[in-house]
Amino acid sequence: MARAAATAERGASPHSLKREYYDALRQLTLELAGIQLGRDHAFLIETRLASLARAEGFPSLADMVDELFATGQNRLAVRVVSTLLERDTRFFSDMRSLQLFAGVVLPALRRADLGRPARILSFGCASGQEAWTLAMIARQSVAKLGGEPPEIVGVDYPSAALERARAGVYTHFEAQRGLPIRQLLANFEPAGPDGTDWRVRDALRRNVRFEDFHLLSRLDPLGQFDCVVFRGSLRRYSGPAQVRVLRGVTQVVGENGFLLLGTGDAVPHVGYGFEEVDGLSNLLRRRVVKPVEADTEAEPKRTRFGPG
């Protein structure tokens, strides 16, 4: 009641914000996620956060933002930022990078004879289409070449999009965008009250999971991965955030593991212990540092601290 009264007193529309709040929300997004929203994002801010305000039980968007900056709620701040950063993702997008995954990464991991299922990280997985796409490609590879299907882990900020990824349910429109009909029928089943949605089948779901994760935090708790897939969003980050994100993802890539970026992406200042595969800027592999073998027969150097 108090919130509604405050809104009425302001005489503002349920979706209007104080002008200074736009700058504050852009700064919050930069600080929490390392991504700078443009000054032309006012419409995006209002439309996306209006839905979140209703879901959170606020009578208006202005009331939610007032409370966010008055109390500094960490949970609400994360929800706000993750809602602002939700990306429109689709199945089998950026086929050139997916061809590298299918034709280079998976065969190399199979030849490595890991003695366990390979582990693949979908970093910034949004609503899950990338992770499910990787799982479908891997399933085809296993059917053709043998071996075990990899474990695929999708991580992103907690959001409604991530919950949809976990549910594995997509509208007919979403399923049609990029998903070949054979893949749709083999890996999805009709869902929803009228059967017009599509749900991931258990056979595909078995090796895929999704986790809430702050993408700028250390990834060590997730363990080591044989390939980190980070496609199409590197350029969204500010310069310092790019360095922080790349340090995080490269630290969890195991020996001989891969980092797969989107087509056109590249690691700034190539390094981080990786080298390009076949001159491709978006496919990197961890360099293996060979230990130097000691020459046991060599005569020790004579120094004043040494023998003699």
Predicted segment positions?
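Core SAM-dependent methyltransferase catalytic element
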Residues: 270-308
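Conserved class I S-adenosyl-L-methionine
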Residues: 115-128, 151-153
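Extended basic-aromatic, gly/pro-enriched interface segments that bind polyanionic ligands
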Residues: 123, 144, 148-229, 233-241, ...
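A short glycine-rich, Lys/Arg-flanked "PGG" loop and its adjoining helix->strand segment in the class I
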Residues: 243-255
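Conserved AdoMet
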Residues: 2-121
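Conserved beta-strand signature within the Rossmann-like core of class I S-adenosyl-L-methionine
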Residues: 255-263
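Conserved SAM-binding loop of SAM-dependent methyltransferases across substrates and taxa
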Residues: 127-145
